Curated annotation (Swiss-Prot):
Family: Belongs to the herpesviridae UL96 family.
Protein's name in the database: Gene 35 protein
Highest taxon above the source species: Viruses
Region (Disordered): 111-132
Length: 150
């Protein structure tokens, strides 16, 4: 398994463990205790880290798709060179656009690697109250029940 997958799995496990610890500390000490607030802060940081890794993995997948598309367009371009000049210029324009998208995706990956949380995450954390967050984590931790078929 490569290191990115290991890091992603580690992050997922860490996030789930932190959620459970936060719920437990909330139940034992209440929402205003120092130890709970410290754990809650640590949990939110691990959630942000895990979300950033998810986004990075998604962007890397898109980048791979763009690379595949570029290779396909190059093959098409080599076939079109012998046929129609108008189609050739259209394919070259498309290839240029794809290269620009690839550069944009590289830029996004670099910004993710800097570890800057997105403004949406900051808004979500400020909009929800602590008891609501704890209740959401409790619900997520409940076992899944298969639907009964009649």
């Amino acid at each position: 398994m490569n290191s990115n997958k290991k890091e992603f799995l580690y992050s997922a496990f860490e996030t789930e463990i932190n959620k459970k610890a936060s719920v437990s500390l909330f139940d034992r000490f209440g929402g205003k205790s120092c130890i709970f607030l410290h754990q809650l802060d640590h949990t939110k940081k691990s959630l942000i880290k895990h979300e950033n890794l998810k986004r990075q993995k998604s962007i890397e997948g898109m980048l791979q798709a763009v690379d595949t598309s570029i290779q396909e367009k190059r093959k098409e371009l080599s076939l079109l060179k012998a046929f129609n000049r108008h189609k050739l210029t259209a394919a070259e324009d498309l290839q240029d656009k794809i290269l620009e998208l690839k550069e944009d995706i590289h830029f996004e990956i670099e910004s993710l690697n800097n570890g800057q949380p997105s403004s949406q995450e900051e808004e979500n954390s400020s909009e929800t109250s602590i008891p609501d967050t704890i209740m959401q984590w409790r619900i997520e931790a409940l076992p899944r029940v298969p639907s009964a078929t009649f």
